[in-house]
């Protein structure tokens, strides 16, 4: 099963991403679910499981928090080395940070 996580501090953006993910999952035959959608990076870091799954993290780069999406991704990578991480931003100048 693919477990999907969203971390976006803008409520409207987060709800839009949730709708896109849920609509896509309804259209395709994929063993996946939206596990958690939050504005707090620590909510994602607290979530732990011993079960083996595939993980997809959709992370805003610039969060209204002491931890940004890049730092969150590096911490997630330690626990989930094979997870897929997608950075989301509406700031074009921030987009290149994900390739550093």
What are these regions (language model features)?
Residues 25-36, 53, 81-83:
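A generic structural motif
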Residues 3-5, 33-35, 86:
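A structural signal for isolated positions on well-ordered beta-strands in alpha/beta enzyme cores
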């Amino acid at each position: 099963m693919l477990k999907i996580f969203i971390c976006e501090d803008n409520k409207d953006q987060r709800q839009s991403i949730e709708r896109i993910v849920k609509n896509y999952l309804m259209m395709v035959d994929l063993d996946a679910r939206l596990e958690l959608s939050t504005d707090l990076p620590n909510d994602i870091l607290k979530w732990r499981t011993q079960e083996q799954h595939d993980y997809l993290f959709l992370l805003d780069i610039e969060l209204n928090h002491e931890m940004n999406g890049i730092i969150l991704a590096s911490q997630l990578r330690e626990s989930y080395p094979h997870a897929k991480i997608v950075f989301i931003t509406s700031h074009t100048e921030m987009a290149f940070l994900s390739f550093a």
